[in-house]
C-alpha cells in the first residue's frame, strides 16, 4: 500500500518493521501468532507457523523491495513444503479476530487464499511483473487454484 502511493520503501521506519517481521520468523521458515498474544503481549509475533500468517509476513517483506532476502526464500519454501497434494493448506490454529479475548473466528479460506496470493506476489516480484503472463501464472499454482475453485463451488 505505501509503495503504491509513492512512499519511499527504504525509510528507516519501514526497515524496522521489516526487521521485526524477520525476527519473528520460525525455524521452519514460517510465521505464526496465537490468540494468546492478546492476553500476553510478550507472545506477539510468536507461535506455531500457519500458512495464512506466513503469507501475510511474506507479502509485507516483499513490499519492502528486496526479493532476494533469505527470509523470503525460507517463507516461500515453507508454503511450498506444507502445501497438501490437493493444493490446499492445513491450518489448525485460529487466525481471525472477532473481539479479542472474547471470541475468535476461523476463516477457512484464509489458509487457501493468502498463501496463493503470497506465492503469486513473490513470483511477480522476483521475476518482474511484466514476465507474469496468465499461462505462466496458471502453471505455477495449478493445484491451489483448482482447490480454490472446488472449495468455492462447495460453499
Task: Enumerate the language-model features and the residues they cover.
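An alpha-helical repeat/solenoid feature that recognizes helix-turn-helix modules
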Residues: 1-129, 154
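Basic polycationic patches enriched in arginine
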Residues: 133, 138, 143-147
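N-terminal charge/polar-biased segments
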Residues: 141, 154-155
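Short, intrinsically disordered C-terminal tails of secreted or membrane-associated proteins
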Residues: 150-151
Amino acid at each position: 500500500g505505501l509503495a503504491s502511493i509513492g512512499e519511499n520503501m527504504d525509510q528507516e521506519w519501514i526497515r524496522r518493521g521489516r526487521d521485526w517481521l524477520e525476527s519473528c520468523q520460525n525455524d521452519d521458515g514460517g510465521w505464526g501468532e496465537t490468540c494468546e498474544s492478546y492476553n500476553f503481549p510478550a507472545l506477539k509475533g510468536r507461535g506455531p507457523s500457519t500458512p495464512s500468517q506466513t503469507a501475510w509476513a511474506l507479502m509485507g517483506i516483499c513490499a519492502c523491495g528486496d526479493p532476494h532476502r533469505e527470509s523470503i526464500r525460507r517463507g516461500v519454501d515453507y508454503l511450498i513444503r506444507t502445501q497438501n497434494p490437493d493444493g490446499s493448506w492445513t491450518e489448525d490454529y485460529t487466525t481471525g479476530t472477532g473481539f479479542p479475548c472474547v471470541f475468535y473466528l476461523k476463516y477457512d479460506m484464509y489458509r487457501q487464499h493468502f498463501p496463493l496470493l503470497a506465492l503469486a506476489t513473490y513470483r511477480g516480484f522476483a521475476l518482474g511483473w511484466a514476465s507474469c503472463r496468465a499461462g505462466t501464472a496458471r502453471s505455477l499454482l495449478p493445484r491451489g487454484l483448482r482447490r480454490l475453485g472446488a472449495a468455492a463451488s462447495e460453499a
